[in-house]
């Protein structure tokens, strides 16, 4: 039996070993299809990262599909039922690295746009694609650089669907209409090294810092709101000492992370953290890394169109959630764009034997096409 257009393209993409930041020819496949539809293509290569920006039309509104061609490493090959870069169909599921995150989504986007343009060759507004090979990596030279380039020339995205695997049990059961912000602090507390038998001749930075860390961990940073849970504070890494049991350390390194809602700003978080550390009299320094601001699309044409499209396919409205980690949507939202995430079920992403239900790819294609119908048809 001949593969459907979306399954055939998904297989082609999965077969290319595009472990981040490699693209391995995935974008060329997409570009070839988009050129045939009349898209203007602009390649944007920054260091080791391959990106492209494609646009069809010059009018507003500008609707964009955003995604990434890179995938995480396959992990232990012995644990895969099938080779991770040899797309294989088993019992109605397409197996392979990137099947759900997010080469399946990319195939759905392309086929949906092909079908939409066939029905609406003179559609309203403009359609764009923003594709990167640097989403699974350090996200330095990917979407953020493309967004900076577009903003510098005042080419602003109005509405964007990011194809991240948002769904939990069935495709379209969850639409992500926002994400929390993320900021990390690398704290170094200074003390005086010494012998554990002579603590009066030393100053243990661990002992000094623990009460402050306990206070930070116990703090209610905010109460969240209708769209976001309360801001969370977590300590993922601690490091002190030489490894010897008889040496008081001279320094104590602590890494902590906030996932924060729209109730807080990164500057407010910094101010409150420094206030606690200062109150405990610590000799310290903090290096802050802001990974992304929170964003929220709580109303607007895009959200209404996506919800309607999902309802038409599933006969049930999706849940609107802001849970999970960060995504490239945070960079696009900086333009003032309406941004939502809609993609496959995320149960197997980043795992061995990653897979996606083939029927879900067909449904997702329909959801994308119906969204275009509502917005630009």
Swiss-Prot record:
Q: What's one Pfam family here?
A: Peptidase_M20
**UniProt cross-references to SUPFAM superfamilies, sorted A to Z:** Bacterial exopeptidase dimerisation domain, Zn-dependent exopeptidases
Write down the Gene3D superfamilies for this protein, in alphabetical order: Zn peptidases
Q: Which UniProt keywords apply?
A: Amino-acid biosynthesis, Cobalt, Diaminopimelate biosynthesis, Hydrolase, Lysine biosynthesis, Metal-binding, Zinc
Disulfide-bonded cysteines: none
UniProt-listed Enzyme Commission number(s): 3.5.1.18
Catalytic residues at: 70, 135 (proton acceptor)
| Obligatory cofactor(s) | Zn(2+); Co(2+)
Extract one GO BP annotation from the record. lysine biosynthetic process via diaminopimelate
The annotation note on the cofactor reads:
Binds 2 Zn(2+) or Co(2+) ions per subunit.
> Which Gene Ontology molecular function entries are recorded, alphabetically?
acetylornithine deacetylase activity; cobalt ion binding; succinyl-diaminopimelate desuccinylase activity; zinc ion binding
**What is this protein's function?**
Catalyzes the hydrolysis of N-succinyl-L,L-diaminopimelic acid (SDAP), forming succinate and LL-2,6-diaminopimelate (DAP), an intermediate involved in the bacterial biosynthesis of lysine and meso-diaminopimelic acid, an essential component of bacterial cell walls.
Q: How does it assemble?
A: Homodimer.
Q: Which NCBIfam families match?
A: dapE_proteo, PRK13009.1
Q: Know the name of this protein?
A: Succinyl-diaminopimelate desuccinylase
Q: Which organism is it from?
A: Vibrio cholerae serotype O1 (strain ATCC 39541 / Classical Ogawa 395 / O395)
Kindly list the organism's lineage. Answer: Bacteria, Pseudomonadati, Pseudomonadota, Gammaproteobacteria, Vibrionales
Which gene produces this protein?
dapE
């Amino acid at each position: 039996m001949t593969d459907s257009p979306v399954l055939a393209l998904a297989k082609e993409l999965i077969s290319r070993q595009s472990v981040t930041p490699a693209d391995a020819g995935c974008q060329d496949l997409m570009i070839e299809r988009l050129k045939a539809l009349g898209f203007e293509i602009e390649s944007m290569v920054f260091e080791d990262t391959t990106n492209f920006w494609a646009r069809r039309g010059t009018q507003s509104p500008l609707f964009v599909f955003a995604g990434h061609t890179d995938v995480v490493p396959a992990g232990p090959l012995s644990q895969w039922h099938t080779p991770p870069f040899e797309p294989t169909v088993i019992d109605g599921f397409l197996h392979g690295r990137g099947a759900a995150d997010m080469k399946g989504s990319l195939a759905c986007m392309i086929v949906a746009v092909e079908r939409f343009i066939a029905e609406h060759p003179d559609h309203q507004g403009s359609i764009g694609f923003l594709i990167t090979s640097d989403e699974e990596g350090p996200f330095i030279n990917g979407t953020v650089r493309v967004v900076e380039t577009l903003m510098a020339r005042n080419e602003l995205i109005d509405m964007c669907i990011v194809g991240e695997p948002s769904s939990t049990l069935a495709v379209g059961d969850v639409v992500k209409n926002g994400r929390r912000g993320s900021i990390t602090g690398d704290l170094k507390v200074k003390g005086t090294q010494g012998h554990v038998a002579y603590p009066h001749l030393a100053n243990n930075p661990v002992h000094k810092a623990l009460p402050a860390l306990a206070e930070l961990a116990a703090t209610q940073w905010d109460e969240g709101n209708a769209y976001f849970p309360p801001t969370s504070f977590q300590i993922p890494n601690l490091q002190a000492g030489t490894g010897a049991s008889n040496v008081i350390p001279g320094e104590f390194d602590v890494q902590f992370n906030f996932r924060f809602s729209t109730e807080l700003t990164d500057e407010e978080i910094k101010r409150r953290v420094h206030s606690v550390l200062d109150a405990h009299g610590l000799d310290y320094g903090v290096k802050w890394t802001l990974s992304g601001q929170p964003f929220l699309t709580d109303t607007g044409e895009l959200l209404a169109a996506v919800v309607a499209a999902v309802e038409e396919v599933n006969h049930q409205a999706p849940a609107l959630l802001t849970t999970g980690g960060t995504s490239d949507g945070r960079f696009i939202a900086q333009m003032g764009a309406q941004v939502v995430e809609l993609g496959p079920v995320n149960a197997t992403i980043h795992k061995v034997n990653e897979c996606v239900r083939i029927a879900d790819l067909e449904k997702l294609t329909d959801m994308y096409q119906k969204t275009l119908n509502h917005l630009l048809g």
